[in-house]
């Protein structure tokens, strides 16, 4: 590994071009007010490279989901998920989280824990490629997941709007010795 102490080390002009999360970096660099929780959250997201700048059209689309509905509008759902997944910084589990907080009676978070506890011997490992076909596969997976999750809720007699939380905790308890992907050693 090279360091600044190596004889052949030198800086190049390109080293001065810091393009990491350019819009957020600029906003943070120019912030002159007092720290507050919103600023702390932005700094944390900047550092872990998880800041998602969702455009106003996508936010407007998310807001078209009826907060009080108990029935899924599949066409709108597909459109919303596609827009979210095409946004830099938004991956599959995060997109489902946005939907869950918009209407938990229709949507629940899809993640490794809940997925593995309802699908024996299957691993939740979505591709992060933003191609049209890959996003379509993820949307189909999510729609099927919601259907299957409803069946599990009926079987276990739990309310759907709390299913992701209940099953997350159940997985932590019953699979506490099983590692998750990207957390320590992979399965």
Question: Can you name each region flagged by the protein language model?
Answer:
Residues 77-80, 94, 145:
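N-terminal alpha-helical segment
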């Amino acid at each position: 590994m090279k360091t600044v102490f190596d004889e052949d080390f030198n800086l190049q002009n390109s080293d001065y071009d810091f393009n990491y999360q350019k819009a957020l970096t600029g906003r943070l660099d120019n912030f002159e007010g007092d720290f507050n929780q919103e600023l702390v959250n932005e700094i944390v997201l900047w550092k872990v490279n998880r800041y998602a700048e969702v455009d106003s059209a996508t936010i407007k689309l998310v807001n078209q989901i009826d907060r009080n509905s108990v029935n899924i509008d599949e066409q709108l759902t597909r459109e919303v998920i596609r827009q979210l997944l095409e946004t830099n910084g938004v991956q599959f589990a995060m997109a489902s989280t946005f939907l869950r907080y918009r209407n938990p009676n229709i949507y629940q978070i899809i993640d490794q824990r809940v997925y593995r506890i309802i699908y024996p011997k299957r691993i939740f490992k979505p591709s992060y490629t933003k191609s049209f076909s890959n996003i379509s596969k993820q949307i189909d997976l999510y729609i099927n997941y919601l259907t299957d999750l409803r069946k599990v809720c009926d079987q276990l007699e739990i309310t759907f709007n709390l299913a992701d939380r209940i099953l997350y905790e159940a997985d932590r308890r019953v699979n506490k010795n099983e590692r998750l992907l990207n957390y320590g050693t992979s399965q």
